[in-house]
Amino acid sequence: MLEDLELKDTPIVILNFKTYLESTGERALELASICGDVADETGVNMAVAPQHMDLHRVSDAVEIPVLAQHIDAVDAGGHTGSILAECARDAGAAGTLINHSEKRMQLADIEWVISRMKELEMMSVVCTNNVMTTAAAAALGPDFVAVEPPELIGSGIPVSRAEPEVITGSVDAVKKVNPEVSVLCGAGISTGDDMKAAVDLGAEGVLLASGIILADSPRDALLDLVSKV
């Protein structure tokens, strides 16, 4: 499934648009286009996770992978208000975030969505909060786990500086459990130094949001982010 996305042999940056007005509607298109341009200019893998209502328009506008922010563990049928995997796929999503700290899921539902992503040949990115949950998530066989200590999310304090042992411990744990799973890190990542430190600690990329979305110049912030990897 990842082979179909034609990811390069470089770190990956996944930008989560969350529900910021700065990354909604037309601004979602602008931000996704910036990510695509930076990916072309630098050779670093980029992916974006816009709000569900923007999935179709964003995926139509860019060549980089577009992910859903969440998919529910439901089949087609009577599940009003739920996000259906097939619907996200048909809207252009190449995969989904799972279990973000702002959208927690039960273990059985996490496993269900990962399995559904495999069936639909879509990418799965499971978010975790510490080494133990990262190891547990890796056992379920997603494509990526993204470890983010929740207290650092949006703080401007990078996990690679505040809690580097979370990254190294997660990388070591995943290698033991399922070496096919790639480890990302997030929480407070916003600069080139932050990302370089994360990669040096063993992460294969980053998941981030506000450090880019709320920057005075998202383009300049992205270029700085990938400038040292």
Curated annotation (Swiss-Prot):
SUPFAM superfamilies: Triosephosphate isomerase (TIM)
Reaction catalysed by this enzyme: D-glyceraldehyde 3-phosphate = dihydroxyacetone phosphate
Xref: Pfam families: TIM
Localization terms from the record: Cytoplasm
Catalytic residues in the record: 100 (electrophile), 148 (proton acceptor)
Enzyme Commission numbers on file: 5.3.1.1
Domain of life according to the entry: Archaea
Listed GO CC annotations: cytoplasm
Entry keyword ATP-binding: no
PROSITE patterns, sorted: TIM_1, TIM_2
Group of enzyme by EC: isomerase
Protein family according to the UniProt entry: Belongs to the triosephosphate isomerase family.
Self-association and partners: Homotetramer; dimer of dimers.
Name of the protein this chain belongs to: Triosephosphate isomerase
Taxonomic lineage: Archaea, Methanobacteriati, Methanobacteriota, Methanomada group, Methanobacteria
